[in-house]
Amino acid sequence: MTTDDTRPIAVLGAGSYGTALAIALARNGQRTHLWGHNPDKMVKMAEQRMNTESLPAIPFPNALIIEKVLAHTLQQAQDILIVVPSHAFADILHQIKPLLTTQHRIMWATKGLEHNTGRLLQTVATEIIGEQHPFAVLSGPTFAKELALGLPTAITLASHDAKFADEMQQRIHCSKAFRVYLNTDMIGVQLGGAIKNVIAIGAGISDGMGFGANARTALITRGLAEISRLGESLGANPKTFMGMAGLGDLVLTCTDNQSRNRRFGLALGQGKSAEQAIAEIGQVVEGFYNTKETYLLAQRQNIEMPIVEQIYQMLFCNKNANDVVTSLLERQRKKE
C-alpha cells in the first residue's frame, strides 16, 4: 500500500473530543476534514469556525475543513480517525464500509467496549470491515478542552502495523504540545481506555459521599489491579497498564472534574439517580455503558473485579451507595 502524507485526515465524530483532535491535527499542519452525523450542526460549525456547543471560544485552524457528507469526507482522505461514542462505533463502521477503498487506513480514539456484548472494538472492526485495512487505536490521558487549547498532552498510539503506526505518529506528534508514544498492545490500550471510565465513576461516588483522598487513592490503585487482571486474561501486556493508556488515563479521569465519568459518580454519591446525573452532565457518559460491558467481559473471562461488580450492582440492580461501600470493605481479607 502506498501512502501520501499530503492527503487530508478524515475525523469522524464532531463531539468535543473529535473536534479537539481535529483542531490538534490541523494546528500541526495536517489538512483535516471533520464530519459529524448532524448536518445542521456541521453547517453551524462551518459558519462560525468553532464548535460553540462543546469547545466555545476556540477557533478552528485554517487547515480544518468541516464536512456534511460522509462519502465526500472519505474521498478526500487515506487515513480515517473515528471518534464516536462506543455505542455508535459499530454503526459508523457499517456506514463507512461501502465507501472504503484499498488505500484507507482506520484508527479510532473511541474509548469503550461494544454495547451490550463487552467485546473489544478491535474485534468489532475486524468483524465488520475485515482484515484488509490497517487498524490502530489512539488512547491516553486527554481532556478535549486542554488538547484543543494546545496545552501539553501525551497519548499512546497502538497498532500491529508498524508502518501505519510510524506514519500516524509523525502526522499527529507535535514537539511543542502533543507527544505520541507507540505501542503494539492494542488489547491493553483499548481496555485501559474503556475500564478507567468505570473506576472513575467509583472514585466520584467515593468523593461524593465525602470519603476523602485515602479512599479515592485506594479505589484507583485497586482499580488498576482489576484492569490488569482482566487485561492479562485477554493477552494484554501488563506493562501497558503502567503507561499513558493505563495508569495515566486512569489517574486523570479519577481526579479531575473535567471528567464526565467522575462528575457522574459525584452526583451518584450525593444521592442523585443515574438519570438525573446524566441529564445534568448533558453529554455522553461512557462509563455508564462501559460498566455493564466490563462486567459482562469479566464474567466471561471468570476474572474477579469487585469494584466494577459493585458499580454494576449500583447502576443496574438498584443497590444503594452505602451498601456498595459495605460490600467492598467487608470482603475477605487477602494479600495485596
UniProtKB/Swiss-Prot annotation:
InterPro entries in the cross-refs: 6-PGluconate_DH-like_C_sf (IPR008927), 6PGD_dom2 (IPR013328), G3P_DH_NAD-dep (IPR006168), G3P_DH_NAD-dep_C (IPR006109), G3P_DH_NAD-dep_N (IPR011128), NAD(P)-bd_dom_sf (IPR036291)
Pathway assigned in UniProt: Membrane lipid metabolism; glycerophospholipid metabolism
UniProt keyword annotations, A-Z: Cytoplasm, Lipid biosynthesis, Lipid metabolism, NAD, NADP, Nucleotide-binding, Oxidoreductase, Phospholipid biosynthesis, Phospholipid metabolism
PROSITE patterns: NAD_G3PDH
Function: Catalyzes the reduction of the glycolytic intermediate dihydroxyacetone phosphate (DHAP) to sn-glycerol 3-phosphate (G3P), the key precursor for phospholipid synthesis.
HAMAP family cross-referenced by the UniProt entry: NAD_Glyc3P_dehydrog
Protein name as catalogued: Glycerol-3-phosphate dehydrogenase [NAD(P)+]
Organism whose genome encodes this protein: Haemophilus ducreyi (strain 35000HP / ATCC 700724)
